[in-house]
Amino acid sequence: MVVKNFSDGTVVEIDRGRFDDWCIYIAGTCNRHAPKDVAYFTVVRGFGKRYGVDKVYADFISIYDKTSKSLDRSVLDHIETLSKDYGEYSNKFAIVFTIIYLGMVAEENKVGTRLGKRIKRLGIHQVLYDRYSPTAAANFSRGLPWTRIDNECKLRGF
């Protein structure tokens, strides 16, 4: 299912993946592929350096707070509105934060989840505030019990 077409020809889709029906794909201007956490964490870190971590995190939280188990077109519109603050990078912001939003919806729909969208928030927090590299943040939770990740989230206030 096409979620959004962007002005540069990029298309963001949701389709069946290996585990569920919530696999996110980028298509249009490139070979269709599922974006990796490290790729969008790298972009988020770059936005933090350019626009300030507090602004980028606040914009992320405004999306996070609106995220539920359902895809909501008003959240996509909200992302588009936020993107206007990012000047020449507005399209890149809209694409990356649409992907992050869909990732959070997917996490909320994951069978048996105890962490839901907080797992994405932890990664964003780690790259913006905790000085984790995008690779370290993307790999942080792999193999950890959910209780440890839950504690890491709680230590950061969420």
Question: Which residues does each predicted region cover?
Answer:
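Non-catalytic substrate-recognition and accessory regions of acyl/acetyltransferase enzymes
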Residues: 1-158
